């Protein structure tokens, strides 16, 4: 039986359905698809695995020709967005259209942004197939594409009608992609829930072996935390920024190394360690906290150091373009212990250079 987490945003509230074998029935989605045209957006990797199954599930509804995009962060661009818009226009689809994002974070972000933009807004549904998208990017309404000068710089806040998470999809996920998703899972423990962090420490092998109960609990807990945060601060004016732990450093790594060279979760992992080291140098946490965070990330074979080829100047030029920068001042999300974090705008360049040089 599927577990449901509700994101409560008044008229824009929506359910997250979490379970196994959810692609066998259209029941969770039926209410959003009646009298609608349905355009599925997916990629070349996911289409052979799940597209036929989803089309069969939706056979009672009006599905049109799907959009199949190339796979990878490097294709999260306005050019590929235009492929979605062209398909919508060529098939004469109007505001009675529902877009379905079938894939990972890139597909979800692009489909959501297309839905927010097309004819000033059409409905969309998230069917995330990677761990990272299931626990993070499919929930909360952040949609965007990248720009050569910065990640997720062009986008909108736009909530889905429903999120359908089938944990069975993780059985086809490459190990590297699974590990990248665990960086976001661990983030929730660091910023919000010390008990969950400890549970993760105690269940590394169960998660790595794709134990069904462990996966469903971890995904559900992450979605519960994400829903709680989004309900308090939908457009990231305050507490939602905490979800960006590791991302200011991480986005700099992605932009400098080239999108897709480091997976997003890998960059967030290294960025989380850099944030923890910064906290330690500011006296916010002792070294044992840095060690626990680093050890848990390393247990999932994630990188815990910055790329050897990046120096301070390369980091800082990208970090200064971060969306959290306010009045020219860099704001970092830093752990204050296990289970809590804060926003800090008084970190000097000298300290950051010290952190980056020793990481």
Curated annotation (Swiss-Prot):
Its cofactor is Co(2+); Zn(2+); NAD(+). Its EC number is 4.2.3.4. NAD(+) binds at residues 71-76, 105-109, 129-130, 142, 151, 169-172. It comes from the Bacteria. Zn(2+) binds at residues 184, 247, 264. GO terms for biological process: amino acid biosynthetic process; aromatic amino acid family biosynthetic process; chorismate biosynthetic process. It catalyses: 7-phospho-2-dehydro-3-deoxy-D-arabino-heptonate = 3-dehydroquinate + phosphate. GO terms for cellular component: cytoplasm. Gene3D superfamilies: 3.40.50.1970, Dehydroquinate synthase-like - alpha domain. It is found in: Cytoplasm. Binds 1 divalent metal cation per subunit. Can use either Co(2+) or Zn(2+). HAMAP family: DHQ_synthase. Belongs to the sugar phosphate cyclases superfamily. Dehydroquinate synthase family. This is 3-dehydroquinate synthase. It comes from Shewanella pealeana (strain ATCC 700345 / ANG-SQ1).
């Amino acid at each position: 039986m599927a577990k449901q987490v509700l994101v409560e945003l008044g008229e824009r509230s929506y359910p997250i359905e979490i379970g196994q074998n959810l692609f066998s029935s259209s029941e969770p989605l039926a209410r959003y698809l009646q009298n609608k045209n349905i355009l599925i957006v997916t990629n070349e990797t996911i289409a052979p695995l799940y597209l036929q199954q989803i089309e069969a599930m939706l056979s009672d509804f009006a599905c049109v020709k799907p959009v199949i995009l190339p796979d990878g962060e490097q294709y999260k661009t306005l050019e590929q967005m235009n492929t979605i818009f062209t398909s919508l226009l060529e098939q004469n689809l109007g505001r009675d259209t529902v877009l379905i994002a079938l894939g990972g974070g890139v597909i979800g972000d692009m489909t959501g942004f297309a839905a927010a933009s097309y004819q000033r807004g059409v409905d969309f549904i998230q069917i995330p197939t990677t761990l990272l998208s299931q626990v993070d990017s499919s929930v909360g309404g952040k949609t965007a594409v990248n720009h050569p000068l910065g990640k997720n710089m062009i986008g909108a806040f736009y909530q889905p009608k429903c999120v359908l998470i089938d944990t069975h999809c993780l059985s086809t996920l490459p190990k590297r992609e699974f590990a990248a998703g665990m960086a976001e899972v661990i983030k929730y423990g660091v910023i919000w829930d010390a008990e969950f962090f400890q549970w993760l420490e105690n269940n590394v092998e169960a998660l790595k072996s794709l134990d069904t109960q462990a996966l469903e609990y971890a995904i559900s807990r992450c979605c519960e935390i994400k829903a709680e945060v989004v309900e308090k601060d939908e457009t990231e004016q305050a507490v939602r920024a905490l979800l960006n732990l590791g991302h200011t450093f991480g986005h700099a790594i992605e932009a400098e190394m080239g999108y897709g060279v480091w997976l997003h979760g890998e960059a967030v992992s290294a960025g989380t360690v850099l944030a923890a080291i910064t906290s330690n140098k500011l006296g916010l946490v002792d070294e044992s906290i840095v060690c626990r965070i680093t050890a848990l990330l390393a247990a999932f074979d994630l990188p815990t150091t910055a790329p050897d080829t990046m120096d301070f100047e390369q980091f800082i030029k990208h970090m200064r373009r971060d969306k959290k920068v306010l009045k020219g001042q860099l704001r970092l999300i830093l752990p204050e212990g296990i289970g809590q974090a804060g926003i800090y705008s008084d970190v000097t360049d000298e300290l950051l250079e010290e952190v980056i040089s020793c990481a």
